[in-house]
């Protein structure tokens, strides 16, 4: 698993090392920022000025024996990476592209200056007198998840904040805007074709239904190819399009489709048969399709190299990790991972029926992400509530942090966030999370489902007794901070 690669020492242990250099105001003032990216240098200077009081000169080339902070592109490496290199009189921050270089600067600010970007309404820049940096060390990081998305308006509405948390600022990056998911009806609209050509659609119980396409009909293939070409022509900067089933389970069971599905051991057989043919016509593009509900079980045939499998965990219990409570999904995930390295996970981390109700899935977020990464998931889309919900800011932050580095400790993330975002009230918010998770565990087996209802937990973690206890924790949390403070408003919003 491509995770945190540390050549000599891990960041969290740097503060304990004796092999360090202390940079105070005077010694740091001797440094120059060297880079061709003036905007990034200005960003670094903003934080240095606010934290330690230093604003460094900026040059675009290394000159003489000056001490420097070098912000450097290294395009020789094709895979995403960034690195922090510390030597006698230099700090070099590298990335293989502009985004990864920015991420490297943010890593430096976070790990060595203590900067935190908790939400769009709170950035913490500690006032410090010195920076402790390691001597003669390199820290190299290659993210195992290359496209990280948390379905939260905090990231969608503020691309700068998304950058700092190292996630995308749109739900479907690089996708054709009008063909992202459930697209069959967009390529061959039922209202346009069904009356004259019912044979284009699914055969079930002797009748053609305008539900899904017949994937072995050659005319359907040609129309979809033409439609895909038209979509790409209109949205020429996009590199990905979804060619995927509509949101129902009424797939075609004609003799030809059924023969393929039986041979392949899954209705995904006819889907991959069809999508591979589309993909061959667009070798420089990525064709995304769904492994969802009836197509979740993998077939025998491998998807082509430019096919992206979007595997959806919609059926799974969120009270326990997938590898413990959703064995069928785990089996399908492992099956797909043997067929392709192009897997995009569509995961679910909220309850669609009531976004504001408590949804104690805290203990499953990290193990589920770890499971996805271990099975070739290079893209992960965590479908959160998008709009404000229970502990919205914390959930957005925590999922982003774990997508960037799945090795992080979620309890440490929660403590860091609650202390920083809620001030002295944070300890009570953290206690609430701990307690509701404990009460869920006591109620097991309990199926925590995205289409469930809070009323199902009224005898368990949402019992009157438990609700009273949780309420008292928030009363204590509010009482611990000034009513006029931002902390108070954030606790009320939690």
Name every feature range the model reports, one short phrase each.
Residues 298-306, 311-351:
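Glycoside hydrolase catalytic-domain groove-lining segments
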Residues 4-14:
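Sec-dependent N-terminal signal peptides
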Residues 288-315, 356-364, 389-396:
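Substrate-binding cleft/loops of secretory-pathway carbohydrate-active enzymes
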Residues 219-220, 230, 328-424, 431:
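Structured mid-domain segments that build the active-site/substrate or prosthetic-cofactor binding neighborhood
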Residues 261-278, 305-323, 403-409:
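Acidic, His- and aromatic-enriched active-site or binding-groove loops in soluble protein domains
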Residues 23-25, 30, 35-43, 47, ...:
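Feature activates predominantly on carbohydrate-active enzymes
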Residues 48, 56-82, 152:
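Short, well-ordered secondary-structure micro-motifs within conserved domains or adaptor modules
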Residues 59-61, 403-494:
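Catalytic domains of carbohydrate-active enzymes that cleave complex glycans
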